[in-house]
């Protein structure tokens, strides 16, 4: 069935109020969009921030008469008589199929492919990780994940012990195992990430080599030959002593989740423990690598 979509240009202060009112008016779905392509980086714990310029998008049944709803919105003092909005009809589609069509196998480096389960594997002789998009965790499409995957592909991981610090979907942990790592330890603060990592490891037949922990449960004597941490600049700085402690002498380190302008400061900080390399960049993001002193 077709739908009617109402788009309202507003700001972060009023978006939630408008959303509540539209739900009362019969909207079956509300989403928020960025009005001016403004990124949000490193929100505080527990925050779900909105963009300063936010578009509220409401979906209604096609039979809905929006005239009373728009009249009601015009009476709101923070919108006013001439508030910016757009009404359009949306034809029904197989939304699941359309969503799936957006994801294709992606190659990282020379050996590694990340493939959705519904796609044919392009190169059966390559190192193939089967991973479906889900939750808010990495699937290889974000530049920081891509930078880490390319780095892992460049290493000889045969018989190496690896730590994936902030494992999320487990994409880096699973990739390391498929690339030959002896074992991987994944650590994350989110129990959903632990579950997602375990499920993806099982799908790729490497679950027997993957140990997963919440931070408070990780072994005190844990050490690895290779450690990759794709988190954010704040946690990378805060956790630096612990991360350094986890890497064996002459072990390898990769840090990502960093904006370009944050890379030098983090590199300088980690140079207490590591011989740091020049940063690698992709779009606005950076990856740092180093060798444990």
Curated annotation (Swiss-Prot):
Query: So where does S-adenosyl-L-methionine get bound?
Result: 145, 166, 188, 230
Q: Which organism is it from?
A: Shewanella baltica (strain OS195)
Mind telling me which InterPro entries this protein's record contains?
Ribosomal_L11_MeTrfase_PrmA (IPR050078), Ribosomal_PrmA_MeTrfase (IPR004498), SAM-dependent_MTases_sf (IPR029063)
Domain of life, source organism? Bacteria
Question: One short Pfam family name for this protein?
Answer: PrmA
Q: How is this protein annotated for GO cellular component?
A: cytosol
Q: Which chemical reaction does it catalyze?
A: L-lysyl-[protein] + 3 S-adenosyl-L-methionine = N(6),N(6),N(6)-trimethyl-L-lysyl-[protein] + 3 S-adenosyl-L-homocysteine + 3 H(+)
The name under which this protein is listed is Ribosomal protein L11 methyltransferase
């Amino acid at each position: 069935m077709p739908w009617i979509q109402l788009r309202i240009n507003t700001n972060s202060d009023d978006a939630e109020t408008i959303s509540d009112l539209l739900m009362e008016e019969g909207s079956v779905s509300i989403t928020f969009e960025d009005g001016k392509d403004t990124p949000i980086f490193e929100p505080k714990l527990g925050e779900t921030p909105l963009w300063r310029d936010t578009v509220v998008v409401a979906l209604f049944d096609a039979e809905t008469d929006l005239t009373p709803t728009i009249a009601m919105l015009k009476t709101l003092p923070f919108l006013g008589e001439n508030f910016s909005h757009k009404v359009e009809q949306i034809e029904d589609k197989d939304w699941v199929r359309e969503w799936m069509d957006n994801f294709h196998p992606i190659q990282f480096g020379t050996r590694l492919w990340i493939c959705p389960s519904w796609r044919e594997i392009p190169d059966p002789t390559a190192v193939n990780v089967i991973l479906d998009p889900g939750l808010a965790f990495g699937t290889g499409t974000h530049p920081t994940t891509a930078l880490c995957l390319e780095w892992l592909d460049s290493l000889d991981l045969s018989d190496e012990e690896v730590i994936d610090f902030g494992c999320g979907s487990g994409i880096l942990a699973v990739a390391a195992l498929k690339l030959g790592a002896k074992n991987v330890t994944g650590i994350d603060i989110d129990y959903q990430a632990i579950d997602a990592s375990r499920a993806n490891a099982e799908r790729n037949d490497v679950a027997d080599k993957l140990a997963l922990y919440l931070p408070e449960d990780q072994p005190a004597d844990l050490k690895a030959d290779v450690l990759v941490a794709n988190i954010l600049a704040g946690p990378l700085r805060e956790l630096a002593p612990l991360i350094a402690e986890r890497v064996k002498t002459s072990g390898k380190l990769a840090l990502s989740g960093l904006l370009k302008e944050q890379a030098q400061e983090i590199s300088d900080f980690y140079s207490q423990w590591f011989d740091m390399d020049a940063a690698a960049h992709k779009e606005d993001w950076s990856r740092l690598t180093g060798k444990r002193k």
